[in-house]
């Protein structure tokens, strides 16, 4: 797995065969409304893929704008935290798909408004070659005289399950963190978060994040995929092993079940102090929902989470191979 660094638009290439298995849909609708050239529109707008990105590799493009200024290296200037923002996302995966938008403020899941309606997650359908501009604002009164981090996740095929597919993938959308701060503010994050070393450091060249049931503590470059389906009883607790490979320092692990952030060891995320050349290894506990059914499990890792965004650290986050939690 290779790290992806693209700016000001972040673009991620995908493995098309795997992606097609996740994203294929019989009910795709064609969006034909052009995205306006100027920002400031109040409605969700769909349009044909922008000509300037026609030569980009197949995949996705993600950006956040404030309506007046070009976002450079992931820094978005706002006067107030609830000012309008515009999430721009383009599908060039060569497959039509549904997507779900999730937002996290300082790495905790938050609700947001679109056209005056509150959402914890926003689903939309996008044909290949089509982009969408989604006007959002946060329901937040945080002080932007210092920087805060807005993580934007757009995940593909939210209504499909890994358990029903022949292939597994860790390329199912994009997640990136943008720094929001007042133009007159100080670009520094005021955080008292304590990062801890993982349970063990393993010698490994593996790069990225993995969540599975392999609890072996051997030094190895080979990391096992998770099972496509894990079966639990309602409310049952189960431990999973995490692996965070070749991050150079502070890293957060965030896990979603059914597209909702879940607590990890009593917090919204796991804060790990990793070291280069090693794979951080430990365990987290997941509690099965009380209602029977299928729930998709996804995870992502945020490198240098509270470091101001620059060209050196503004890139899409690594995502783990998704799997299905079946509650019976």
Language-model segments: which ranges?
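N-terminal Sec-pathway targeting helices
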Residues: 1-16
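A eukaryote-biased signal for short, well-structured alpha-helical docking elements
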Residues: 18-63, 173-212
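Short beta-strand elements
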Residues: 161-207, 305-328
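Beta-sheet-dominated interaction scaffolds and their linkers
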Residues: 57-82, 216-234
């Amino acid at each position: 797995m290779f790290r992806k660094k693209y700016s000001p638009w972040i673009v991620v290439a995908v493995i098309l065969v795997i992606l097609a298995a996740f994203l294929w849909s019989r009910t795709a609708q064609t969006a034909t409304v052009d995205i306006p050239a100027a920002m400031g529109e109040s409605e969700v707008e769909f349009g044909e893929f922008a000509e300037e990105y026609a030569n980009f590799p197949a995949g996705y493009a993600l950006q956040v704008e404030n309506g007046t200024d070009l976002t450079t290296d992931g820094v978005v200037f706002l006067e107030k935290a609830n000012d309008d923002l515009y999430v721009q996302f383009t599908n060039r995966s060569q497959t039509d798909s549904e997507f779900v938008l999730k937002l996290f403020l300082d790495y905790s899941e938050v609700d947001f408004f679109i056209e005056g309606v509150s959402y914890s997650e926003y689903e939309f359908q996008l044909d290949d070659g089509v982009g969408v501009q989604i006007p959002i604002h946060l329901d937040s009164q945080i002080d932007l005289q210092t920087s805060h981090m807005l993580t934007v996740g757009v995940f593909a095929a939210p209504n499909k399950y890994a358990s029903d597919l022949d292939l597994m993938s860790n390329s199912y959308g994009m997640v990136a963190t943008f720094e929001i701060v007042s133009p007159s503010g100080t670009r520094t994050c005021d955080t008292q978060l304590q990062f801890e070393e993982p349970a063990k450091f393993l010698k490994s060249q593996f790069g990225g994040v993995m969540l599975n049931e392999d609890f072996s503590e051997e030094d190895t470059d080979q990391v096992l995929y998770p099972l496509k389906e894990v079966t639990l009883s309602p409310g049952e607790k189960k431990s999973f092993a995490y692996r965070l490979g070749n991050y150079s320092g502070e890293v957060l692990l965030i896990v979603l079940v059914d597209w909702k952030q879940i607590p990890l060891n009593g917090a919204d995320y796991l804060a790990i102090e990793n070291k280069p050349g090693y794979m951080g290894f430990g365990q987290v506990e997941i509690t099965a929902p009380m209602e029977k059914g299928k729930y998709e499990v996804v995870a992502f890792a945020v490198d240098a989470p509270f470091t101001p965004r620059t060209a050196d650290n503004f890139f899409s986050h690594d995502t783990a191979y998704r799997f299905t939690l079946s509650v019976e």
